[in-house]
Amino acid sequence: MVEMTETSNEKLITKIAVSIMALFLLVSWLPAFGMPLGDSHEGRVLGQFALHMKNFWSMGAADSSFGASWEPFSDIPYTHHPPVLTFLHVLVSAIIGEGLKQIKLISYVAGVLTIPALFSMGRNLGVSSKAVTISILMLIATPWWWVYGRLGLGLLPNVLMIGTIWAATTNPTKRKIVFASLATFFAVAASWHGVFLMPFLWFQTWRRRKFDQLTLSLIGASILGGLVILFWVSQGGGLSELGEHIGERVERDWTWSQFAQRQWDFAQTLLPLWYMILALPAVLVGLIDSRTRFLTTSLISMVIVFALVPSNGAWVHDYWNFPILLTLFPGFAVMSEWVIGFIKEKIKLTSPKKIDSITLGGFLLLASALILTLQLSDLHDEYFKETSDAGELIASIELSSGQKTAWHLPQVPWPTWVSNKWDVPTLSLLNAGDLGTVPSDDIVLFRIDRIPDWLDEKIEFAIEERKGKYATVTAHVMKQHVTGAKK
């Protein structure tokens, strides 16, 4: 463990490094900021919140279930998740209006703000600022973070809760207690992860302080957050509908060996090789070090429970286990601290300026190497540019007044962004029988590179509108290309 006392130059260097990382995210994310919502996780999630925002203002607070309505995509208010993100979208739209950039603003800003929040959290854990900075670099240098760090509020609510509670536990001033209570309310009312994690954090605080103003304030904040969730669910889809949704998440039609293989495939896609090699040591170090042991244990429990209980979510969504990045963060910070301490002992430079220069130069060299391995251009094209083609295609087509449903094949899943753009419900055509019910002049959206078995691949030559991998044809044309259909 390195000494926690740091010179003013060292503090300045770490602040510069953290600012550079936040700026890197801002600049590298900007190209996707103005792209239309399309066939991606971002398109599906933010398309949903675009509907929440639109319905709140068009239907009113009560009729829209306080923003939970996402008609016409679904008639049942969406209250499966705590309400803070929905409320934030409504608030932003009240200030700066509705639109594509307003929809994306919260997610992108939250992603950038997570960087200084992680730095503050790491320092409150008692880890040196240089080590925390390197751990942040390792986190943002993963495709998992670069792609999904801008989706919703991400890690931000829980990072704020952890950091402020640890700060208040060490030195419980009135101001820190207020910040910890507000952050706890925010995290609980923002995500189920926050609901799960809060009792662990409270227990650790109670062990140190027993019942005092801080522990009682945290109880009050979490209860208030829980009441907000209860109201949100009750006035929206209802507890029974939430139960049905949970039931869908725990159902499975796969084996656990298939599940493990699928998670491994996701990890290989979203995590670089160097990160996976260091992941196990990071877990062990996080558990060994007394400063990070309890937090690492709590976060491991959270990741395991959310992966294995609502396991169908982890089966379907590659981003489901995203919080694992936060779980490994403390361990990577401690490992970095050990390495920095070892290097300091070996180089034995007497000049602080030389040490500062080597530190900054080493950080920039490491950052450059890790960022180069990200292959940002390829990630941007695969996860944003190519999928936004679907949004551009939909935007270029004016739906006829006679078409009341946006038809699509299953290979374009959960297209909330289509409902948002065309203002009609969507329906997936699972087979030729479903296609047979579609009015002949209605258009159908599909992916050219993912033609289902019941369609002839020659349909590619009958396409009427196309953008990238996405295309539309009228139903009567698609019916002519059903496998075995008479021409």
Residues of each region from the PLM?
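Signature aromatic-anchored transmembrane alpha helix within multi-pass, membrane-resident enzymes
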Residues: 18, 130, 178, 182, ...
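Extracytosolic helix-loop segments that constitute the early lumenal/periplasmic catalytic or substrate-binding loops
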Residues: 30-34, 46-76, 84
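Transmembrane-helix motifs of polytopic, lipid-linked glycan transferases
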Residues: 102-126, 163
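Hydrophobic, aromatic-rich transmembrane alpha-helices
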Residues: 113-116, 202-206, 271-296
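Membrane-interface alpha helices of multi-pass inner-membrane proteins
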Residues: 135-136, 166-167, 176-192, 198-201
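Short acidic/glycine- and proline-prone juxtamembrane loop motifs at membrane-interface regions
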Residues: 144-156
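Membrane-lumen/periplasm interface segments of specific transmembrane helices
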Residues: 214-257, 275-281
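Short periplasmic/luminal acceptor-recognition loop of GT-C membrane glycosyltransferases, typified by
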Residues: 380-384, 396-433, 442-448
